């Protein structure tokens, strides 16, 4: 069974020869692994969550059974470095490079109050030239041999607060500020187009996501989620299924996300990610017993403690345990619960792939 067959068997709830593997790296990890393997290091793509679709050749060499694709900045608006070293993207978000990640520095809609403020803001043009070039290249190279996962994370909530600022946006949700619905409608419009396009290009899984969880709880209550977000996700999922009724919809939310899972299943979710095991209520046994008959599990290998701090033998044993729990009767994609971070040794990364690829 080749990688694509294995991946398709899994997402269609059939038993593969083994669980497929899909990991992602931070750029620092990709660089040190490329040096270790004596292969060229490729810079990350110019994309909102670039790690999901970058370094694919390297990750396939290590053992990934699928590759990621994503929307990229168009030819006429690549991310640009400003005079003070800050970075601006096509949404108008301005970041400050801070070690392993870029941190938000200026929110372009920090002073938003009304729908007029939304109408005046310049949003990305989904039809801009060059946006799909990298996705098309990846599919042309790997589409017949590996699974294709299309990234559409920061689907609504996160893009909204990236524009406004987290504290203000959460407060304005509670205050029912005038601009909230127009802003969410505009983001929904753009990301629905992106999702439909990536399905048309040949994606097998559309990987949506917003982080609704914290380590111990949720960032908002279910009432707020059901008022502002769930109806929009329902509409988006319907649009995606119109393009391809067989597309599998994955949802990423870091943290203690389990209270939201039934609502997502109700509106058509197929795959849950990233299964952050140290977050409250995200223990593998609990998730499998509650939702194992309804969703595919994608993730679950701890990047907070297991991969950086344990021995290779401990890592291998824990991955076998994850496969035995989540993968019983199929339905599991072996993956870290986030990008593998730079505090993880080469030895432990190799141990992850070695154990993940075993039958």
Question: What positions do the PLM features span?
Answer:
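Short, structured active-site "lid" loops
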Residues: 42-47, 52
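Short acidic, Pro/Gly- and aromatic-enriched capping/linker segments at domain boundaries
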Residues: 69-86
């Amino acid at each position: 069974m080749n990688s694509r067959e294995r991946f398709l068997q899994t997402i269609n709830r059939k038993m593969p020869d083994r669980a497929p593997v899909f990991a992602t790296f931070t750029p620092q990890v990709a660089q040190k692994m490329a040096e270790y393997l004596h292969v060229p290091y490729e810079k990350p793509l110019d994309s909102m969550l670039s790690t999901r679709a970058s370094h694919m050749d390297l990750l396939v060499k290590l053992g990934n059974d699928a590759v990621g694709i994503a929307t990229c900045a168009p030819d006429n608006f690549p991310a640009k470095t400003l005079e003070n070293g800050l970075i601006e993207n096509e949404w108008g978000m301005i970041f400050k490079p801070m070690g392993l990640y870029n941190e938000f520095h200026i929110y372009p809609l920090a002073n938003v109050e009304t729908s007029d403020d939304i109408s005046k803001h310049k949003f990305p043009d989904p039809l801009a030239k060059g946006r799909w070039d990298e996705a098309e290249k990846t599919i042309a190279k790997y589409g017949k041999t590996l699974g294709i996962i299309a990234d559409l994370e920061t689907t609504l909530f996160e893009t909204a607060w990236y524009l406004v600022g987290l504290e203000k946006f959460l407060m304005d949700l509670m205050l029912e500020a005038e601009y909230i619905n127009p802003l969410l409608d505009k983001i929904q419009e753009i990301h629905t187009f992106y999702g439909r396009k990536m399905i048309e290009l040949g994606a097998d899984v559309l990987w949506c996501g917003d982080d609704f969880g914290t380590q111990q709880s949720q960032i908002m209550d279910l009432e707020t989620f059901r008022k502002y977000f769930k109806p929009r996700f329902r509409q988006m999922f319907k649009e995606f299924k119109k393009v391809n009724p067989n597309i599998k919809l994955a949802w990423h939310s870091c943290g203690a996300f389990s209270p939201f899972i039934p609502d997502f299943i109700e509106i058509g979710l197929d795959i849950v990610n990233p299964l952050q095991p140290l977050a409250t209520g995200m223990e593998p046994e609990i998730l499998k017993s509650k939702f194992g008959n309804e969703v595919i599990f994608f993730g679950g290998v701890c990047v907070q403690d297991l991969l950086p701090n344990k021995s290779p033998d401990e890592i291998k044993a824990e991955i076998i345990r994850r496969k035995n729990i989540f993968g019983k009767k199929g339905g599991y994609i072996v993956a870290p619960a986030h990008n593998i971070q730079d505090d993880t040794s080469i030895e432990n990364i190799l141990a992850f792939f070695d154990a993940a690829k075993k039958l």
